[in-house]
């Protein structure tokens, strides 16, 4: 299920636009994740008090965590599938400490694509979206494999 060189180029080109505003993109991704999938908020102890969109919008901690999430994902995407060294510690913390189900990784992947499509519609057409979906699916599948290595069925 690897990506072609052209698909990786599409992924990294649009990711460059995401990186131009990590706080804006990251904050929007997490707000949308919690709005569209409220059950995911239960996995974030420090954000459980954020009940309304206004509270989420005003949260600097949520914005900072959004930057962390997208920064780490960017490091993984830039490895073009050769992401073992970046992925392993992330999978370990998500499996053993945070206990984030793979389903939640699917949710955030969907949200990431929606947010990019809204913010960069002219640059994120069907081909780029398909490439990003493949890249995020590769990431999720590899996370799921690592989860099993750490004894988490996620």
UniProtKB/Swiss-Prot annotation:
GO cellular component terms, A-Z: extracellular exosome; sarcoplasm
A molecular function annotated in GO for this UniProt entry is:
nitrite reductase activity
Q: How does it assemble?
A: Monomeric.
Q: Where is the Globin domain?
A: 2-148
Q: Which GO terms describe its biological process?
A: removal of superoxide radicals
Q: What is the lineage of its organism?
A: Eukaryota, Metazoa, Chordata, Craniata, Vertebrata
Quick one: which residues bind heme b?
Answer: 94
Query: What does the UniProt keyword field contain?
Result: Cytoplasm, Heme, Iron, Metal-binding, Muscle protein, Oxidoreductase, Oxygen transport, Transport
Instruction: Work out whether the entry's keyword set contains Nucleus.
Output: no
**What family does the Swiss-Prot or TrEMBL record give for this protein?**
Belongs to the globin family.
Role played: Monomeric heme protein which primary function is to store oxygen and facilitate its diffusion within muscle tissues. Reversibly binds oxygen through a pentacoordinated heme iron and enables its timely and efficient release as needed during periods of heightened demand. Depending on the oxidative conditions of tissues and cells, and in addition to its ability to bind oxygen, it also has a nitrite reductase activity whereby it regulates the production of bioactive nitric oxide.
Q: What highest taxon heads this organism's lineage?
A: Eukaryota
PROSITE patterns hit by this protein = GLOBIN (PS01033)
Catalyses:
Fe(III)-heme b-[protein] + nitric oxide + H2O = Fe(II)-heme b-[protein] + nitrite + 2 H(+); H2O2 + AH2 = A + 2 H2O
* Compartment(s) where it occurs, according to its Swiss-Prot or TrEMBL record: Cytoplasm, Sarcoplasm
Q: What is this protein called?
A: Myoglobin
Q: Tell me where it mainly resides.
A: cytoplasm
Matching InterPro entries: Globin, Globin-like_sf, Myoglobin
Which amino acid positions bind nitrite, per UniProt? Answer: 65
Task: State the Pfam families in the record.
Answer: Globin
**EC number of the protein:** 1.7.-.-, 1.11.1.-
